[in-house]
Swiss-Prot record:
The active site is at 56. Its EC number is 1.11.1.9. It comes from Bos taurus. Belongs to the glutathione peroxidase family. This is Glutathione peroxidase 7.
Amino acid sequence: MVAARAAAWLLLAAAACAPREQDFYDFKAVNIRGKLVSLEKYRGSVSLVVNVASECGFTDQHYRALQQLQRDLGPHHFNVLAFPCNQFGQQEPDSNKEIESFARRTYSVSFPMFSKIAVTGTGAHPAFKYLTETSGKEPTWNFWKYLVAPDGKVIGAWDPTVSVEEIRPQITALVRKLILKKREDL
């Protein structure tokens, strides 16, 4: 009997100590102003992670739609997380300060922006490596969008030809589900 209890306690202890599977919110990134940020701060929220560029043909359409999405859903545990990238057509050549100024001045963006990074290849930021590996979809141009659930798991990935408006119903459904869960928890 004592041996059985000891074995049960060992199994419980082993399960409690088992490493948790890595997710998007386990990473850190430098924000647009140079401060290291743990993406953990977004855990519990729905995130739309996007590689952005200031001089792309998709810039105007996407920045406007992303800001509208942030405005509409931001108060409800949602964030657009923008990562400038200069890998595709050299369409993000400016400094972080200039990128932020452009986005805020031209589109009044209120969503979090991060420092310019690589999103593909050997120098890709670890968070984007995770997005690529778990979704099976690697960015091939600017404005790839990855929908991340409150638990950090990737729900979907879309290329820039898919508009924010087209995926808005999926985003809204995920936010609605989160709101209902939070109400249940009260």
